[in-house]
Amino acid sequence: MSKINLNKYKNVKRRIGKDWINLNPIQRGGVLPPESRETLQSFGDGYSTCDYCLEGRVDLVDSPPIDDLAGDIAKFVNMDEIMFTAGCRHAQWVALKALTEPGDVIVIDSLAHYTTYLAAENLDLEIREVPHNGYPDFELEVEDYADIIEEVEEKKGETPAVLFLTHVDYRYGNRINPEKVGKIAKKWKIPYFVNAAYTGGIMPIDGRRWKSDFIGFSGHKSWASSGPIGMLATSYEHSEKTFPKSEVKGPWSGRGFTKKIPQLFGCPPVFGAPIATLMSSFPHVYERVQNWDEHLENARWFVDKLEKIEDFRQIGQRPRKHTLMSI
């Protein structure tokens, strides 16, 4: 057996003190409350939630109430169904897999997360970008979605397969009105995906009002859970096609796995700490969202004070519409 220096892997700890405050804007939403740190200890073993699995999928476990959690989160964001995924990036891929064929065109905002681009690349899709106006605001004109749809239809003879909106981007924290894009999607009868990785769990979400067919969420970014974990919200209209059950059958053994979902690798890959902490943190997240207006005012106050320091300037939307910001 090869000799390996194992000492560097022992007693690995995060190099921050307990009295430190994490100000990283893309990490604040994923900070665990005290009760979830206890849950993390209890469910830290890899397959710990599988102790309770009788149905072959972690999302169907009823004690602890994982099945209830999916239903309650769906109500919380005003959508029909929630499925747990291996992060928002996985949620994007699952939805695009259901909605597209190789060579299809999708329209995305030019502030989209890199995982949106990679999901499209993985599925051999063509991308059209809605431009922004550059420094210092980096804002988009929602009406440009309609212009690009018309351009695609003229060139391809058909409309894009999906409209994709990043509710708040991770670089500048700009917030785009999802309802306005939703109206464009409905007018053209195009499926509509909202990436709410940095807003779900932070501020109020209303999928029906937005007219969204899909919403992607990130548990470890914005729902105070360990990771990786995400969620894909959808409507009953798209549910069956998005989460089809396995039909494979062993030609010799006859084995089948009829409760498994191929796009989720059989079972949502969130067993153990990710799903347990998401569940434990839900009351904390629910309360946090109720206080969104206060959090937003605090962010605006913070920007005002920082910009009184010489050479400090906030870039992106003014006034702030999200607590995530770039200075």
What are these regions (language model features)?
Residues M1-N22, R28-G29:
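Conserved N-terminal helix/loop that builds the PLP phosphate-binding region
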Residues P25, S36-T39, F43-A98:
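Conserved N-terminal alpha-helix of the aminotransferase class I/II PLP-enzyme fold
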Residues V58-D62, G134-E139, H167-N174, T199-G201, ...:
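Short, small-residue-enriched loops and turns at beta-alpha junctions
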Residues C88-Q92, H113-Y114, Y135, A197-I202:
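Short acidic loop-to-helix transition motifs that present clustered carboxylates
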Residues L99-Y114:
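Conserved PLP-anchoring active-site segment centered on the Schiff-base-forming lysine
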Residues F138-A196:
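Active-site phosphate-binding strand-loop segment of PLP-dependent enzymes
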Residues D206-H220:
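Conserved active-site segment immediately N-terminal to the catalytic lysine
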Residues G219-H322:
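Active-site C-terminal subdomain of aminotransferase-like
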